[in-house]
Amino acid sequence: MSRAEFSYDFPHRHLLSVADLNPVDIQIIFERAAHHLATNRTPDKRSDVLRGLTVLNLFFEASTRTQGSFEMAGKRLGADVVNFAVAHSSASKGESLSDTARTLAAMKPDIMVVRHSATGAPQFLADHTGLAVVNAGDGMHEHPTQALLDSFTLSQHWGSVGGRRILIVGDILHSRVARSNIGLLNILGAEIRLCAPPTLLPSDVDQWGCDVFHDLDEALKGCDAVMALRQQRERMSGGFVPSEREFFHLFGLTHERLEVASPDVLVMHPGPMNRGVEIHTKLADDPERSVILEQVESGVAVRMAILELIGANIRKEASA
């Protein structure tokens, strides 16, 4: 698709939180993502929608799927994509986020994709750089593009997630993926269940509008989809579970456990995946149940949609 052919009314310059989106915004993203998903399965994957724009990937935390997905998304849309190596930057020498932001903004990129360990870092950059900012994960706060690709993946199977019963199991406490998914699924009208040991649930979880379980077999009953989350040991300062073996015994997903779920239950994982801890390897690789690789494929398409829509707004501003 060329720039001249693209026209969608998406009223956002940034994507910082799923709370900024309404059902119409989400539908627009999903429509564009479906287009890109189909195009990405053909030999001719590229367009010039973002030609002349620069996307800066600024990842202060390690990433494989998300950074690679954003890089591929930008390049397939014709953008110039720059991956900023934070480990070799002045930020690693003690430079403040504010100074890093001003320095990068002076280079005149158009869209900044940011992952940072500090909650609110993408919002800070949006407020202080004048650039369009996409949140690729900030601390334990949010990961909006992951939530969008997760619901998009499910919508490809069901048409809509509204009214579906979806379980998230694992380390809810430290998970920005869980927080963004809960926010988005609530907007879309899904029934959300959470399952974890008490030590891996936030103290205010009773205010999240979800049904909370500590027994996985009870939580799985009648579920249409279940998402396993890894233990985020890099954010843990103590022992939250006795051992990985005990965690798998109580909360690990297996084929046997899924027998109480919906007959067509789908299994998800945002990655990185610890086989034999939160999910059995046979279940993770089961093409009848697992949509984990579909999530990865959807990630490129959804991020293409987001960059495309934000890029269109940047061009509108420039021509106004």
From Swiss-Prot:
Keywords of this entry: Pyrimidine biosynthesis, Transferase
Pathway(s): Pyrimidine metabolism; UMP biosynthesis via de novo pathway; (S)-dihydroorotate from bicarbonate: step 2/3
One protein family per Pfam: OTCace_N
PROSITE patterns, alphabetized: CARBAMOYLTRANSFERASE
GO biological process, one term: 'de novo' UMP biosynthetic process
Residues binding L-aspartate: K93, R176, R230
GO CC annotation: cytosol
Catalysed reactions listed for this entry: carbamoyl phosphate + L-aspartate = N-carbamoyl-L-aspartate + phosphate + H(+)
InterPro entries reported in the protein's UniProt record: Asp/Orn_carbamoyltranf_P-bd, Asp/Orn_carbamoylTrfase, Asp/Orn_carbamoylTrfase_sf, Asp_carbamoyltransf, Asp_carbamoyltransf_Asp/Orn-bd
One term of GO molecular function: aspartate carbamoyltransferase activity
Amino acids binding carbamoyl phosphate: R65, T66, R115, H143, Q146, G271, P272
Assigned EC number: 2.1.3.2
Annotated coiled-coil segments of the chain: none
Subunit (UniProt): Heterododecamer (2C3:3R2) of six catalytic PyrB chains organized as two trimers (C3), and six regulatory PyrI chains organized as three dimers (R2).
Family indicated by similarity: Belongs to the aspartate/ornithine carbamoyltransferase superfamily. ATCase family.
Purpose of the protein: Catalyzes the condensation of carbamoyl phosphate and aspartate to form carbamoyl aspartate and inorganic phosphate, the committed step in the de novo pyrimidine nucleotide biosynthesis pathway.
PANTHER family: ASPARTATE CARBAMOYLTRANSFERASE, ORNITHINE CARBAMOYLTRANSFERASE, MITOCHONDRIAL
Annotated protein name in UniProt: Aspartate carbamoyltransferase catalytic subunit
Organism, scientific name: Maricaulis maris (strain MCS10)
Gene expressing this chain: pyrB
